[in-house]
């Protein structure tokens, strides 16, 4: 059994049957739904086996089409119910693909044997249906609660799963991106048409990270070139085009050796480590990645420790070979492509 109570000397005496302290033991986000049922998987398969050279070389080709119906997904419900979500059987996904597997007996003697195997597959998945009436979801992976615009994945009807959703990085600002510099107020003024990335990074200045604006420019806006959440787009796909593996198995008298390797081709990775190690987010002056080493990043201080950020000509010359933004310009982790 598991005890459901405890004693703590830090808690002062209370009153009533359960004291004056409130403890929430259950997540009240989802309301109970008595109508949920098992998900249903429909599998369609066509395959054939083959063998050559007295089965020393054999293999299998498999073509499939699988559909998962009545997928359990959370649906939004009115807040006045006391809950925010209701689990319902309304989602549907499908997978279509082909797989090839090969086996070869290369050597077969009394004391020694060697065989190899290889497999490769191509799978294409599709989101057929989401919650009732919903066509798109912007989801969060949850890896960092401080992530700016924390919803970093997109799912929509007709699309594939695993789509990374974020901003498109456009390098960093250089001195040439600015119309003027006011030495008195130490402020930079962007040229007309240059994107204002301040909602994501620090006030635009040379060396700060820059992002692409993908939405149409609104001439009636007070700042038409400023970045907004609407400028996010699909920046990657975590589903590989091909995946597979190959292996070797060898035996010699009483000994055996096995090796197996997996591979995936043409897919993207949400590299959260790289995000954290190229920004000031939660870094607390710890180590950065090599991408922002002193000989690569934009620097506002020269080798002697002199501040040069307010000297446009010197700043431009000193950073002419920089390939990375200044990491201090980004204070929170951002889902972006670069």
Predicted regions and their residues:
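Glycine-rich phosphate/pyrophosphate-binding loops
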Residues: 252-272
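Active/binding-pocket-proximal capping segment
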Residues: 64-69, 78-80, 263-267, 274-280
């Amino acid at each position: 059994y598991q005890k459901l109570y405890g004693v703590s000397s830090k808690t002062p005496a209370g009153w009533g049957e359960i004291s004056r302290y409130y403890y929430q033991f259950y997540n009240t986000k989802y309301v109970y739904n008595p109508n949920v049922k098992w998900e249903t998987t429909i599998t369609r398969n066509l395959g054939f086996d083959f063998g050559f050279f007295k089965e020393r070389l054999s293999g299998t080709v498999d073509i499939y089409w699988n559909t998962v119906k009545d997928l359990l997904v959370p649906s939004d419900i009115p807040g006045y119910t006391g809950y925010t979500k209701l689990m319902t059987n309304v989602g549907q996904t499908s997978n279509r693909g082909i797989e090839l597997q090969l086996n070869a007996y290369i050597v077969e003697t009394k004391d020694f044997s060697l065989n190899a195997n290889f497999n490769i597959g191509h799978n294409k998945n599709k989101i057929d249906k989401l919650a009732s009436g919903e066509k798109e979801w912007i989801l969060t992976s949850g890896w960092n609660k401080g992530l700016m615009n924390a919803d970093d994945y997109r799912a929509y009807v007709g699309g594939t799963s695993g789509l990374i959703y974020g901003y498109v990085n456009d390098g960093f600002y250089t001195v040439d991106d600015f119309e003027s510099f006011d030495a008195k107020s130490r402020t930079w003024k962007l040229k007309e048409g240059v994107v204002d990335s301040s909602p994501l990074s620090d006030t635009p200045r040379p060396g700060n990270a820059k992002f692409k604006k993908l939405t149409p420019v609104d001439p009636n806006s007070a700042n038409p070139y400023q970045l907004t959440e609407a400028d996010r787009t699909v920046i990657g796909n975590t589903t590989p085009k091909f995946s597979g593996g190959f292996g070797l198995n060898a035996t010699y008298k009483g000994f055996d050796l096995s090796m197996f390797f997996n591979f995936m081709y043409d897919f993207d990775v949400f590299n959260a480590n790289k995000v954290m190690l190229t920004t000031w987010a939660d870094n607390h002056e710890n180590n950065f990645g090599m991408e922002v080493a002193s000989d690569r990043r934009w620097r506002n201080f020269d080798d002697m420790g002199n501040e040069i950020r307010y000297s446009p000509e010197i700043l431009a010359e000193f950073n002419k070979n920089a390939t990375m933004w200044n990491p201090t310009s980004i204070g929170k982790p951002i889902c972006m492509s670069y």
